[in-house]
Amino acid sequence: ESGQLAVSKSPSDYIPELKGSAFDRVTIQQVLDHASGLAFEENYVDPKSDFFLYYAPALNLGYLPGAADLQPGESDIYGVYDFLARFVQPDPETPPGFRFDYNSANADVLGWLVSRLMNKPLNEVIRDEVWSKLGAEHDAFIAVDRAYIPVATGGFNATARDSARFGVMIRDKGVFRGERVLPASWLEHMVDVKKSDTEAMARNPNYSQADWIAYQDMWWILDAQAEEFCAVGIHGQVIYVNRKTDTVMVWFSSQRDAASTLAPEFPIKL
C-alpha cells in the first residue's frame, strides 16, 4: 500500500543476494502462494534430506550433532539467509506458478523481504506494525536462526487469546477496535481466488482431493465465497476464520510429529 513493493516483481529485485538463486525467476506473489517451483524438498523425517543437512541447522534446530555449535565462516550455509541465497535451486521441470507445493523457504524469503524494506528486524516490524495495535495481553516472541536473525517460517510464540485477537483483525479486514492495522485491499485479495489458483493446487496430487481449494497470500483457503480460510502450524496449531459467519477460532496443539493438513484428523477438527 505504501508503494515500496510490487508483488509482480522478483524478490531479487529487492534482495540482490538472491540473484542467481531459485528466487530470482519467481514473483513475490508466487512466493506468497507457495508456487515458486523449488527443487528443495521439505522432509522432516529423513536424516539424509536437505532439510536435515542444511535447513534445520541453519534454523538453529540443531538436529545434527554439533550443528548448533558451528561458528561463522565454518560453513557456506550458516544462517537461513545463506541457505536461501546459496542452496535453494529452481526445479527445471516445474515453472513458477504452475503448481502449489508448500515449502518453508518461501516464508523465510518473505521475512527477509519485509525486514529489508522496513530496514529493521522482522520481530520489530511485527511489534510496531501489528502486535502493538492489537491490545495484546502478553508479549510474543520469535525464534532466531543460527546467525541470530528472526525467522519467518516458524517459531512465533503467542498465547491463544492474543492469537485470536490477530484472527479477529484478519476477519475484519485489517481493523481492530476501530483502528486500521493492515490494508483492507490486501486482506480482500487473499480470498480473490481465480481459476489459476485452484488449478495450481489441483496439480499437486497430494492436494487434488483435499478440502482446501487454493492457497493464497500465505493462507489455506477453504471457501472463497464464504471467505473461509486458515493459518496452520506444523504441530497442529490453527487460526480459523469465516467472515460469512463472523467466526474466529484458535486452537493449539503439541503433536509430537509434524502435522499435515492432509491427515484424516484435520478435517474433523474443522
Placement of each model-derived feature along the sequence:
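Structural recognition of the beta-strand scaffold that forms the well-ordered cores
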Residues: 30-33, 101, 139-142, 155-157, ...
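Flexible glycine/proline-enriched surface loops and loop-helix/loop-strand junctions
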Residues: 89-96, 106-108, 145-152, 225
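Active-site helix/loop module of the DD-peptidase/beta-lactamase fold
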Residues: 2-44, 89, 117-154, 158
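Short, gly/Ser/Thr-rich active-site loops of penicillin-recognizing serine hydrolases
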Residues: 259-270
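Short, charged, amphipathic alpha-helices and their helix-cap/turn boundaries
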Residues: 5, 12-13, 47-96, 120-139
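Carbohydrate-binding/catalytic loop surfaces
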Residues: 52-55, 144-158, 204-205, 209, ...
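Active-site Gly/Thr loop motif
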Residues: 137-141, 188-248
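Active-site SXXK
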Residues: 1-6, 31, 110-114, 163-170
